[in-house]
């Protein structure tokens, strides 16, 4: 048999084999390209919609680089690093049996340390605090990757700095009697009866509270008072409570004149009544939040605070006498209408009414640096779609 004849036989054999092969679809081909397929799925699953979430949520390796979260703070808490420069501390126990001398492995032990710590949790936990949890400076409490619920007593941040609280569900908080409580590396100190706040921030700075869910407390869900400043509350979900977010506690607390606070990308819904926020003295940017009905009012204040409401969505309650977004208190109408309460690209729905006052303030360099660029109110449903505690899994975008 000649070489030419052999080549013809080989050609026809290969052609026949090719024809007998099943036709593969694009999906079949992707079986042989797992890396491309996984990438496509990861991108589809990633739903980071605002400037803070885009900084970290689409990174599948977030669990191996948790402290990168500290680079994502925006607003007036920008630069807050929490426990970034310290060790990662894993909470292994949900117990709170000894508040004066907590055992190693508990959240209370970690929170009281004088050194920077990035605190994470070994597993899902419901931590029933027997007294308020006093958090020391330079701490991050990071609940990503597990479900962490704190109940019965809340968190106290008093005269501290550089705190990040992230992805924690705090609810059903009661007034606690006080007593000897561990607050640092030294001996326990005598603490008075707590107010029953979910989170109480007093005299503290560089505080970032992000992706937390807060509900059902005896007093306020979140109080920020007594000269606290450079605070950002972002991506949180507030539900089922009367007094939600207080920025300045009293008209005689003049130290709050320097307060700078950002309220951004939060969801206020499901039977919230008022103080979202309630402001005194300071300078406040309230930007791209979702207000899904309220009981008495949404934003209020006294003592001439500056409130810049930018790109929020206000969906008013059905009650015709509750359509006003704002509540000005503590002085006559003429004086309160001189306060700088401004609205810019807010979306007013279901008859919501926003009555602005004053004029657009001239911002200081520090105020300019802390402003988050606002998107129009029409974008708020997207921007706040992941507000509250996230369900994160290691090895995948959060």
Swiss-Prot record:
Residues binding Ca(2+): 195, 219, 223
InterPro entries: AmbAllergen, Pec_lyase, Pectin_lyas_fold, Pectin_lyase_fold/virulence, PEL
Stretches of the chain forming a coiled coil according to its record: none
SMART domains xrefs: Amb_all
Pfam families cross-referenced by the UniProt entry: Pectate_lyase_4
Enzyme Commission code: 4.2.2.2
Residue positions the entry lists as glycosylated: 37
One GO biological process term: pectin catabolic process
Disulfide bonds: 55-72
Function: Has pectate lyase activity.
Protein's name in the database: Pectate lyase 1
